[in-house]
Amino acid sequence: MTEPGQVPTGKDMADRMAITEIIALHCRGVDRADEATLKSCYWPDATTAYGSDAVPAHEFCGQLAQAIQGYDQTHHMISNSIFAFDHEKAKVESTLIAFHYLKADDGQDTEMTYFGRYLDIFEKRRNIWKLKHREPVMSWSQNAPASHDAYHPALSALRQAARFPDDLVYG
């Protein structure tokens, strides 16, 4: 462990960058409903606790990719990651903001905004950092009628995000 504010070593910075990449890649996996990308973020023996009990993470990745397709669009963002290293393990707390857009047949589309944190345990094996355990903690959420307007003149020329494998990131 390091003292808060202590200048990190080059190794510490490299470890932080590798972990930060996995955290961001997980967000991409969720937003694109990409099961393979989600699984690549976890060790095969990893667990996750999106409810009261820890479950095998690789099994959950398939369920999450399927469930997220129920939304027309999602956007997950991470900020304020705090790292606590202990040799080849790291506890990481990251602030999460997630937006969910749901179209409705009756035209009453909704937006759900979620604020919380990911409490993660990472392990480094063979010089690779991956998640060993993830537990989201909710701070609050807000549901409201949708204000999304993809056809606004300022936005209408932009390509729309899509799920795996149709999103531009896979091209």
Where in this protein do the model-derived segments appear?
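Short beta-strand segments enriched in hydrophobic/aromatic residues
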Residues: 30, 42, 96-98, 135-138
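A solvent-exposed, acidic/Ser-Thr-rich amphipathic alpha-helical stretch
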Residues: 35-102
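Short, surface-exposed coil-to-beta transition loops
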Residues: 76-78, 113-118
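Short beta-strand edge/turn micro-motifs at domain boundaries
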Residues: 91-93, 115-149
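Acidic/histidine-enriched, glycine/proline-rich intrinsically disordered or flexible terminal extensions
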Residues: 142-171
